Structure formats: C-alpha cells, structure tokens
Regions:
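Active-site acidic catalytic loop and adjacent metal/ATP-binding pocket
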Residues: 1-2, 110-153
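A conserved alpha-helical element in kinase catalytic cores
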Residues: 3-42, 46-47, 52-74
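Catalytic cores of nucleotide-enabled group-transfer and carboxylate-activating enzymes in metabolic
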Residues: 11-13, 42-46, 52, 76-77, ...
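A general structural signal marking secondary-structure boundaries and capping sites
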Residues: 30, 68, 72-79, 112, ...
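Conserved kinase catalytic-core helix
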Residues: 53-87, 101, 105-106, 111-112
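Active-site activation/catalytic loop segments of kinase-like enzymes and analogous catalytic loops
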Residues: 155-189, 203-222
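Amphipathic alpha-helical protein-interaction segments enriched in hydrophobic
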Residues: 194-206
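Regulatory N- and C-terminal appendages and interdomain linkers associated
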Residues: 227-236
Length: 236
C-alpha cells in the first residue's frame, strides 16, 4: 500500500532546508498538534505525509486557537522562556529562529509595536489555510516561515486570515478564541496573556502585510470591510 504524500517544491534550496528544519523543531514540541512526517528531503523539494483535505472554517476558530496556544506554551517552556523578541534564538541542531524585528523592520517603521520586553512565542503563519482537521486532531502545514513573535501575534494572523477568506466573523467567537488561547498559554511565573486590545493592534499590523494579497491566495474580503471590531487607534 502506497501512502499518500504532498510534495512542495522550492526554487531556492536554502528555503527548502529552512522549512525542513522548522518542521522538525515544531514536531519536537510534542503538544498534541499533528505535524506531517517528512518522507524525503531534496534540495528543491520536500515530500510530506498527506493528512487529508478537511480544511477548517470560521466555526473552528476556537479549536485552532487551542492548538496554537498549546504550541506556544510548549515552545515557551522548552526554549523561548530565555528568548528576546529583538534577538535571534538559537535552537537545537543548528537552527536559529529569527527575531521578530529584523524581518518586519519596514512595517515597524510605519507602525511601531512596543514588544521588545514582552515574553516570546513564535510566528509560523497561522493562516487558516495552514491548518487541517484530522481524525487525530488539528494538524499544521506549511513550514516556510518561523520567527519569534509576542504571544497573540499569530492568533491575530488566524483571525485576519479567516475574516479575509470567509467574511466577517462573530465578535463573540473571536473573543472566545482569545480566551481559549490565553488559557492554554498561561505560565505560572510570567504574564503571557494577550489582551483584546493587543490582539486588535496585532491584526492591524498584519493588515499592512497582507493587504497586497487581496483577491489572491484565497483572500476574498478586504480587512476594513470585515473587521470584527471598530478600527483601533494605533501608534503611527
């Protein structure tokens, strides 16, 4: 019996190697979130275990927030408790997780975020299309991006990508997703909670980075048209 696989191709072999290393790091979190097995790695392609086609939708926001919270809590406990958001974080097997600031410097110049002193989680691009629902729970796919990020930042990407894909979200469901996320990221010795205001500001920051993809990559709705709250006042 031949197992189904998914092949992702890369023009740049460095991108392929980085994605493979990111997948390995995420798989080692062991937090009851499925990570597809890497069947083979070549300079220009990665071949993954195929985990099906069941895509989540807006009604799955809470279960996705729970999975994201478990991943961030496991990463903080295992490695990122010692990380700073403005410095790269060395990991096992030579992996270095990029800092939050450097790859976003232009966007931060336009919209400063005072995050350097906050505890570190990570960003792996929690676009709703980068999750699958399986018989064994939530799975994550697409390992191209991995940087440090404040707690709640990747949850904001989940919110904005879901709204831009499916339309306006129920504000109460977004609120519940944040509560669920904070419940699963809670630490005994540091405040990792993302406030509703922080979530809104992070979403506006993501809007800077995703607006150019409107009507591409599954984004059918402009964020200002589907924002599930009033536009927050943010520092410019």
């Amino acid at each position: 019996m031949t197992c189904a696989v998914f092949t992702k191709r890369y023009e740049d072999p460095r991108r392929a190697a980085a994605a493979g290393a990111h997948r390995e790091w995420l798989a080692r979190l062991e937090c009851d979130v499925r990570v597809p097995a890497l069947r083979s790695a070549q300079p220009h392609q990665l071949v993954f275990e195929h985990l099906g086609h069941q895509r989540p939708g807006p009604t799955d926001l809470d279960v996705l927030a729970q999975a994201l919270g478990r991943m961030h809590a496991a990463a903080y406990t295992g490695q990122l408790h010692a990380a700073r958001l403005d410095e790269p974080s060395p990991g096992p097997h030579g992996l270095v997780i990029r800092d939050f600031v450097t790859p976003r410097r232009d966007a931060l110049d336009r919209m400063p975020l005072p995050v350097a002193a906050l505890p570190a989680a990570f960003y792996k691009d929690a676009n709703i299309r980068n999750f699958l629902l399986t018989g064994e729970g939530v799975a994550i796919v697409d390992f191209d991006d991995l940087t440090l990020a404040p707690f709640g930042y990747d949850l904001a990407k989940l919110v904005i990508s879901t709204a831009m894909t499916h339309g306006r979200l129920d504000p109460h469901e977004v609120e519940q997703a944040l509560i669920t996320y904070n419940t699963h990221t809670a630490q005994p010795d540091v405040d990792t909670a993302c406030s509703p205001e922080q979530l809104r500001v992070y979403a506006e920051f993501h809007h800077q980075l995703t607006a150019r993809y409107l009507h591409r990559n599954g984004y059918h709705h402009a964020w200002p048209d589907v924002r599930p709250w009033r536009e927050p006042e943010v520092a410019r």
